[in-house]
């Protein structure tokens, strides 16, 4: 989870445009899976449940819950997980929030992230610093590399000659391996000045 969250954050935050950090992604918070549809509040979920599970029987309760977990809106609307206290520190014990707190809050919460120097939170902080310190993230043209590659998503941010002369930065290479497999790549012909950020110590 941690390595994947760092990778996804890196891919998004080093692209062109204005990035935003939304609803606990800087902690690596995950979608929730409730085993009772009553725990969801989204009206579309309850409408679909009534149509396809209760009335027509076209979809089993188990399959619908899996679908909701993957595609529903409430799965990412759970309360912010601040610490491992009751309700994840979002509200006092005995107070019922609009949605239940994700049951994984004892492990995934802001306090735990602050206590772990290798957490998703600190990677996001590094991403923000990188954007501030390297103008190419703001000015560089986006160039997708090898769009046929089904394992690796890689792109360049490339400065114009004028911006490169002003900043000393010609190109920034971003590589994201979406698999568990080790891959060998040679996008830059071996000509890399430095690695500015990585989510894995296995990089070589």
Q: Can you name each region flagged by the protein language model?
A:
Residues 1-204:
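Active-site and adjacent substrate-binding regions of carbohydrate-active enzymes
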């Amino acid at each position: 989870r941690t390595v994947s969250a760092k990778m996804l954050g890196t891919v998004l935050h080093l692209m062109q445009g204005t990035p935003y950090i939304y609803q606990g992604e800087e902690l690596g918070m995950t979608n929730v899976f409730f085993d009772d549809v009553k725990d969801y509040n989204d009206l579309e979920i309850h409408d679909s449940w009534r149509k396809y599970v209760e009335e027509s029987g076209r979809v089993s309760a188990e399959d619908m819950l899996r679908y909701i977990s993957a595609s529903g809106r409430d799965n990412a609307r759970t309360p912010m997980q601040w610490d491992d206290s009751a309700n994840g520190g979002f509200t006092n014990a005995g107070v019922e929030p609009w949605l239940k707190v994700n049951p994984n809050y004892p492990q995934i919460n802001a306090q735990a992230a602050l206590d772990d120097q290798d957490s998703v939170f600190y990677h996001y902080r590094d991403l923000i610093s990188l954007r501030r310190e390297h103008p190419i993230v703001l000015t560089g043209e986006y160039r997708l590399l090898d769009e046929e590659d089904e394992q690796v998503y890689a792109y360049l941010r490339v400065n114009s000659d004028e911006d490169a002369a002003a900043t000393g930065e010609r190109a920034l290479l971003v590589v994201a391996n979406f698999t568990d497999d080790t891959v060998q790549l040679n996008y830059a012909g071996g000509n890399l000045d430095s690695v500015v950020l990585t989510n894995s110590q296995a990089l070589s």
